[in-house]
């Protein structure tokens, strides 16, 4: 009980500080939310006859119509339940889960950012559906990385993954070529040289833009830099992890990356790149949805893997859906999850949302994943992408990490001292409850190359 209370307290604090995460979580603008931060799909106002009323909460914004189309089709194809899909901002949704863990006021089906699922499972937000999906013949079609995020330490399932994403390097090739570089950098040394040659302080142009904000969004983008050097979040005081953060700190301190990165969400770093104010960007899969529209032909761009030190690295993003504790329609909700994540729906939804499928058999069902060279880079990046957790106290681990990185970037502490201080928080937690072996690679590239 003491551990449960500690986790609940941590999540309450975490939820109050969380901002909308685009990383692997969708993004864009939505005019559909009401004054309370939520909105229901249009079909909610229609008569559902004698079907049981089921609520589904999600924080998809520009992807909402694609999700609602699947929900509407499911409602038409069966008469046991009628699902109402309701948009709730990510921050509010996480708060509602935390409160609902105590009050019991939860939706029937809920969406969650993949690294957060273990935390809410530990609080009892999601139902154990192992008996329903463990023997499901489709389960072996799911990539191991995303699927791992739906399991607890004992291998029990509490949901199904809906989509994946990862991070790569977007390059303004006009700026790079003008500086004498015809190809994107592949190593840290090359990357540093490109940053030096492309930064133009008088024009407000930096060599690199990324998100290092003090939220999970920052952790999402920061992790590849320590992992590429051979570190990880459970070895922050190692020379490898310190090296990764020192590399980023030097970029800021040397004026090659704006100090504003500590305040930027991924969307703001993205906007800076699209406006021609950064030669390179740490970019997420979902940004493929509107990059051409934003750039509007003002410059040539190209995607590449994030530059490496010892090895290539990226971070897995994405969302999961789970059946919430206490629903009257448990079996029906599980049936919908299987429907939502069938091969065709997974292919259609992820293609429309500029994300990556979580199923191997979905890749060949939409030509976008096999013919678009930009997707090919992200698909390759999935082979090096690491899952965040899963861990019941991931919010605590993440906060310790991004807080320390910000202190280093701003020069408040040395990279070494900052990482050692973060390790002092993280090490006792993972000593008692270790992280699982890193799940690397979604396998998507193997199916399209």
Locate each region found by the language model.
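Extracytoplasmic/periplasmic substrate-recognition and gating elements
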Residues: 72, 76-77, 177-179, 246, ...
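Extracytoplasmic "Venus flytrap"/periplasmic binding protein-like
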Residues: 73-142, 149, 174-186, 279-280, ...
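Hinge/lid segment of periplasmic solute-binding proteins
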Residues: 113-167, 192, 200-203, 218-221, ...
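Glycine-centered hinge/linker elements that transmit conformational signals in sensory
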Residues: 194-197, 201, 234-262, 306
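Long, aromatic- and glycine/proline-rich binding clefts that accommodate carbohydrate-like moieties
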Residues: 150, 301-304, 351-403, 407, ...
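Short, low-complexity disordered leader/linker segments with a strong preference
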Residues: 1-55, 76, 370, 427-449
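Periplasmic solute-binding protein
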Residues: 117-125, 130, 144-183, 211-233, ...
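Short, well-ordered beta-strand elements
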Residues: 49-61, 81-86, 108-109, 158, ...
């Amino acid at each position: 009980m003491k551990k449960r209370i500690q986790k609940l307290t941590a999540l309450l604090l975490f939820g109050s500080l969380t901002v909308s995460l685009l990383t692997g979580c969708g993004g864009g603008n939505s005019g559909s939310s009401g004054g309370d931060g939520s909105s229901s799909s249009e079909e909610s106002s229609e008569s559902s006859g004698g079907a049981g009323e089921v609520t589904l909460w999600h924080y998809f914004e520009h992807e909402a119509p694609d999700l609602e189309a699947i929900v509407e089709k499911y409602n038409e194809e069966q008469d046991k339940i009628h699902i109402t899909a309701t948009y709730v901002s990510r921050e509010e949704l996480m708060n509602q889960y935390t409160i609902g863990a105590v009050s019991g006021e939860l939706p029937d089906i809920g969406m969650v950012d993949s690294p957060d699922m273990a935390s809410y499972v530990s609080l009892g937000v999601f139902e154990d559906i192992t008996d329903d999906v463990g023997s499901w013949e489709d389960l072996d079609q799911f990539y191991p990385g995303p699927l791992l995020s739906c399991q607890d330490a004992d291998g029990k399932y509490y949901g199904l993954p809906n989509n994946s994403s990862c991070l790569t390097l977007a390059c303004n090739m006009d700026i790079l070529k003008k500086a004498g570089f015809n190809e994107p950098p592949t190593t840290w040394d090359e990357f540093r040289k490109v940053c030096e040659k492309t930064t133009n302080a008088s024009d407000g142009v930096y060599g690199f833009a990324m998100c290092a904000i003090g939220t999970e969004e920052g952790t999402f983008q920061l992790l590849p830099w320590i992992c590429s050097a051979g570190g990880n979040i459970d070895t922050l005081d190692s020379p490898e992890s310190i090296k990764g953060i020192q590399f980023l700190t030097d970029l800021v301190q040397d004026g090659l990356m704006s100090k504003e990165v500590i305040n930027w969400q991924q969307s703001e770093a993205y906007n800076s790149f699209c406006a021609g104010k950064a030669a390179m960007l740490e970019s997420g899969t979902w940004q493929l949805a509107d990059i051409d529209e934003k750039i509007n032909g003002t410059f040539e761009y190209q995607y590449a893997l994030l530059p490496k030190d010892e090895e290539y690295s990226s971070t897995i993003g994405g969302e999961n859906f789970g059946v919430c504790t206490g629903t009257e329609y448990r079996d029906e909700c599980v049936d919908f999850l299987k429907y939502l994540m069938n091969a065709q729906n997974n292919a259609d939804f992820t293609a429309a949302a500029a994300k990556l499928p979580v199923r191997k058999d979905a890749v060949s069902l939409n030509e976008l994943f096999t013919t678009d060279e930009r997707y090919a880079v992200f698909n390759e990046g999935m082979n090096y992408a690491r899952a965040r957790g899963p861990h019941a106290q991931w919010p605590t681990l993440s906060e310790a990490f991004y807080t320390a990185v910000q202190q280093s970037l701003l020069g408040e502490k040395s990279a070494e001292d900052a990482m050692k201080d973060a390790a002092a928080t993280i090490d006792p937690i993972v000593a008692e409850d270790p992280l699982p072996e890193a799940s690397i690679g979604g396998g998507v590239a193997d199916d399209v190359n």
